């Protein structure tokens, strides 16, 4: 389901850093590697792209899909790289999940060369994503407060002022934050719900979901998202803040 949510944001994120042939780029919290794979062609044979994630299962998928990238398992708050190791660092939809986002940003700053470029994307407030907003309300009613809280955390860094502040506090300069909108597409509201509950954030946490609770959740979300149903499936807007900065 990665294409449904993330792929359309990749060119926007990479445009912010304007990769050049021969450069070294680090993709922090790379997941299955969609950003890193796209970057390979931009840095060319003389460049080098590294994708880092703390989740070994995600990296296994990434390795199978992107042999031209160096995949590393590691912690964004303690990057296993030397100071000034990269020309560019990017992070797509990972910053909000780090236990200490400030520490992760300081680490990104450390591994960049002087004048290095950094770009990050984080979702705006959950109200800007009707699909996830409806899902979170349903989770609260049918699964529980813990599940709803985990879903809300995906949108937990949705304030542009806060994003700018933590970047500047980490030592970044020339910080620019802008808001963008894209459309997330799924075959149906049911598959969207199942993907999030069983295969995305909640699926990696151990939160137990009973069959009858999931069925009730699917019915509620399907009803709430009828205004966003199209002939080819579900399509709802999502908004993100994209920030660019330099060391």
What are these regions (language model features)?
Residues 24-79, 88, 103:
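Class I SAM-dependent methyltransferase SAM/SAH-binding core
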Residues 102-117:
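A short glycine-rich, Lys/Arg-flanked "PGG" loop and its adjoining helix->strand segment in the class I
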Residues 117-145:
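Conserved class I S-adenosyl-L-methionine
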Residues 87-101, 124:
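A short SAM/SAH-binding and catalytic strip from SAM-dependent methyltransferases
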Residues 6, 32-34, 151-247:
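Conserved Class I S-adenosyl-L-methionine
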Residues 4-23, 38:
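Conserved alpha-helix/loop element of class I SAM-dependent methyltransferases that forms part
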């Amino acid at each position: 389901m990665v294409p449904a949510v993330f792929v359309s944001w990749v060119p926007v994120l990479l445009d912010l850093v304007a990769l050049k042939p021969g450069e070294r780029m680090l993709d922090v919290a790379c997941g299955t590697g969609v950003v890193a794979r796209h970057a390979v062609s931009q840095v060319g044979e003389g460049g080098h792209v590294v994708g880092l994630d703390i989740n070994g299962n995600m990296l296994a998928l990434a390795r199978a899909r992107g042999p031209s990238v160096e995949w590393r398992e590691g912690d964004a708050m303690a990057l296993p790289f030397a100071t000034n190791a990269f020309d560019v660092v990017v992070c797509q939809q990972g910053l909000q999940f780090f236990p200490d986002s400030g520490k992760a940003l300081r680490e990104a700053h450390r591994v960049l060369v002087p004048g290095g470029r950094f770009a990050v994307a984080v979702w705006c407030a959950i109200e800007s994503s009707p699909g996830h907003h409806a899902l979170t309300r349903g989770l609260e009613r049918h699964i529980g407060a813990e599940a709803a809280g985990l879903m809300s955390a995906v949108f937990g860094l949705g304030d542009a002022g806060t994003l700018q502040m933590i970047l500047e506090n980490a030592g970044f300069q020339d910080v620019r934050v802008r808001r963008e909108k894209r459309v997330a597409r799924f075959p149906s509201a049911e598959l969207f719900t199942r993907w999030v509950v069983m295969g995305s954030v909640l699926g990696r946490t151990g939160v137990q979901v009973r069959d009858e609770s999931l069925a009730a959740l699917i019915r509620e979300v399907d009803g709430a998202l009828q205004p966003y149903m199209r002939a080819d499936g579900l399509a709802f807007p999502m908004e993100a803040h994209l920030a660019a900065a330099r060391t």
